[in-house]
C-alpha cells in the first residue's frame, strides 16, 4: 500500500524556471507526513514562455550591463503574471480545489547571480505579490538571498531536497541536475552531503543549436551526434579557471554564455555540428571530472532536468564514469522533469514549518537559515 493512499495533507505547488528559460515548470506535491521526507507528484505541467519575453530573459541572464529600471520593473511584473498563469493552469487541469493548496513556492527567474562580488548578490525576478494576488494562494519566494546574506553562494539549493528524499541509501549516490547549468549533489552513505554547480549544460547547447540549427534545443542530441568533438576547443573550454575552483561554488548564464564559447574558438573555423558535439562533451567532462575527484566511490548517478532526455549526453556521461550506474531519478519515484519544481514546493513547506533549508556545507553560509519570504494570499 502506498504511504500516500490515505494521506489528506495540504498540497504545495512549486514553480521553477531555470537558466535555459525554456518554460515554467509547475508541480503539485503532497508530503507523506509533517517531516516532509517523502513526497509524491500529484500533477505537473510545463508552460512555454512567450517568445519575446523569453528572448528578454535570456538577454538579461547573459549579463547585459545596462537595463532601464522601467523596463526591468515591467519584466518583473510580466514574469510574476506568467508564473501565476502557470499555477492557475495546473490547478485547473488537475481538478484540485484551490483551498487544498497551502502555499506556492516560486523560484522566480534568475537574471543575475554574483556570489563572489563585494557585496555578493543574487537576483530572481517574478513578482511574488502578483502570484499571490492572481492565484489567491500564499506564495513563498526569494529563497536564495538569505543564504547569500549569511555568506553563502545562494546555490545550489536542491541538495537539501535531494538529501531529504534520497538520503537513506546503502551506497554512495549522486544526484545530477542537467538544467541550463549542471549541478551535483553528492550523498555518501556516511558523512556530509556536498553540492555544487559543475558548469554549463543545456544553456550553451540550446543557444548554439538555436543559432546554427534553427531549433530551440537539440532533440535527443541528434545535432551533437552528427558532429565530432574538437579536442583543442574542448581543452580551451576546460581551461577556464572556474572549473578548478573547489566547492562551494555556483555559476550561471552570465558567466557561461555563447560569447564565452565563441571566444574560446579564436580564429578556428569549426563545423557547427562539431561545436555542438564539443559543448556536449564539455558538460560530460566537467561533471565526470568533479564526480571522480570528489566522490569516486559513487555507485549510482540519478539524473534529472532536461538533459535526462538527451541520450547522447547520458551515454557520454556513462562512458566517462565506468563502474557507476547512470539512470533517471524516475526509478526512485521522482519525476526528472519536475524535480526542481517539486524542490521549491518543498522549500516553501519547510519555511512554513519553521525549518532551515540550506546546507551550509554546500553553500558556504555561516549556518542554517530559514529561506524565503512569505507573500500572504
From Swiss-Prot:
Keywords, in A-Z order: ATP-binding, Carbohydrate metabolism, Kinase, Nucleotide-binding, Transferase
Biological processes per GO annotation: 1,6-anhydro-N-acetyl-beta-muramic acid catabolic process; amino sugar metabolic process; peptidoglycan turnover
Pathway where this protein functions: Amino-sugar metabolism; 1,6-anhydro-N-acetylmuramate degradation; Cell wall biogenesis; peptidoglycan recycling
Gene3D superfamilies (alphabetical): 3.30.420.40
EC number(s) given by UniProt: 2.7.1.170
Molecular function, one GO term: phosphotransferase activity, alcohol group as acceptor
Regions crossing the membrane: none
Top enzyme category: transferase
Binding of ATP, residues: 18-25
Chemical reaction(s) catalysed: 1,6-anhydro-N-acetyl-beta-muramate + ATP + H2O = N-acetyl-D-muramate 6-phosphate + ADP + H(+)
Task of the protein: Catalyzes the specific phosphorylation of 1,6-anhydro-N-acetylmuramic acid (anhMurNAc) with the simultaneous cleavage of the 1,6-anhydro ring, generating MurNAc-6-P. Is required for the utilization of anhMurNAc either imported from the medium or derived from its own cell wall murein, and thus plays a role in cell wall recycling.
HAMAP family per the UniProt record, alphabetical: AnhMurNAc_kinase (MF_01270)
Family statement: Belongs to the anhydro-N-acetylmuramic acid kinase family.
Protein name, per record: Anhydro-N-acetylmuramic acid kinase
Organism lineage string: Bacteria, Pseudomonadati, Pseudomonadota, Gammaproteobacteria, Lysobacterales
Gene: anmK
Amino acid at each position: 500500500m502506498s504511504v500516500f493512499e490515505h494521506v489528506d495533507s495540504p498540497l504545495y505547488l512549486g514553480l521553477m524556471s531555470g537558466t535555459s528559460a525554456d518554460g515554467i515548470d509547475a508541480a503539485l506535491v503532497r508530503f507523506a507526513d509533517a517531516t516532509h521526507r517523502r513526497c509524491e507528484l500529484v500533477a505537473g505541467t510545463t508552460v512555454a514562455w512567450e517568445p519575446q519575453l523569453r528572448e528578454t530573459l535570456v538577454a538579461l541572464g547573459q549579463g547585459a550591463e545596462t537595463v532601464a529600471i522601467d523596463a526591468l520593473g515591467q519584466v518583473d511584473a510580466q514574469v510574476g503574471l506568467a508564473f501565476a498563469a502557470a499555477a492557475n493552469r495546473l490547478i485547473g487541469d488537475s481538478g484540485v480545489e484551490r483551498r487544498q493548496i497551502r502555499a506556492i513556492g516560486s523560484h522566480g527567474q534568475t537574471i543575475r547571480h554574483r556570489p563572489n562580488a563585494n557585496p555578493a548578490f543574487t537576483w530572481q525576478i517574478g513578482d511574488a505579490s502578483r502570484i499571490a494576488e492572481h492565484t489567491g494562494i500564499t506564495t513563498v519566494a526569494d529563497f536564495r538571498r538569505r543564504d547569500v546574506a549569511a555568506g553563502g553562494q545562494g546555490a545550489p539549493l536542491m541538495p537539501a531536497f535531494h538529501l531529504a528524499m534520497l538520503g537513506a541509501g546503502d551506497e554512495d549516490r549522486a544526484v545530477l541536475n542537467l538544467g541550463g547549468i549542471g549541478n551535483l549533489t553528492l550523498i555518501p552513505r556516511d558523512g556530509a552531503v556536498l553540492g555544487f554547480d559543475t558548469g554549463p549544460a543545456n544553456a550553451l547547447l540550446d543557444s548554439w543549436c538555436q543559432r546554427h540549427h534553427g531549433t530551440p534545443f537539440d532533440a535527443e542530441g541528434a545535432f551533437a551526434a552528427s558532429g565530432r568533438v574538437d579536442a583543442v576547443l574542448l581543452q580551451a573550454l576546460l581551461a577556464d579557471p572556474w572549473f578548478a575552483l573547489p566547492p562551494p561554488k555556483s555559476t550561471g548564464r552570465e558567466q557561461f554564455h555563447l560569447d564565452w564559447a565563441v571566444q574560446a574558438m579564436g580564429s578556428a573555423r569549426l563545423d557547427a555540428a562539431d561545436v555542438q558535439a564539443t559543448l556536449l562533451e564539455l558538460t560530460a567532462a566537467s561533471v565526470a571530472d568533479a564526480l571522480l575527484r570528489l566522490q569516486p566511490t559513487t555507485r549510482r548517478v540519478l539524473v534529472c532536468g532536461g538533459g535526462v532526455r538527451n541520450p547522447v549526453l547520458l551515454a557520454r556521461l556513462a562512458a566517462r564514469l565506468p563502474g557507476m550506474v547512470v539512470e533517471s531519478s524516475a526509478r526512485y519515484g521522482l519525476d526528472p522533469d519536475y524535480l526542481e519544481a517539486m524542490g521549491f514546493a518543498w522549500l516553501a513547506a519547510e519555511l512554513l514549518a519553521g525549518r532551515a533549508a540550506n546546507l551550509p556545507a554546500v553553500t558556504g553560509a555561516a549556518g542554517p537559515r530559514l529561506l524565503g519570504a512569505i507573500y500572504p494570499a
